[in-house]
Amino acid sequence: MKEKLLKIIKHYGLNHQQRKLEEEVYELQEAITRYEMARETNSTGGIYSLVAFEEHIVEEIADVCVLLMQITDYFKLDVPSIDKIMEMKIDRQIERIKNGEHN
């Protein structure tokens, strides 16, 4: 998969893929908002419609992940280092929650 990801980002260029990432993050946010609105207003037309909203969220998450993986591979970043930093940030946020912080 790494070779394919590098081929894509080298073809379109880093700047283009950065803009694409921004677009895909926006689409993910929009998909989540639509899901929440439908759930809160019960305007989904039934449970099967909620499943469609969830599937759309999954698709948008995949789009964002693909672009993040392209950028990670482009810069030859160490994935275990990213995982370690993510774990530290998660732990820090859990501490904030324990301390009653809301940010």
Give the ranges of each region predicted by the language model:
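Flexible "arm" and connector segments at domain edges
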Residues: M1-N103
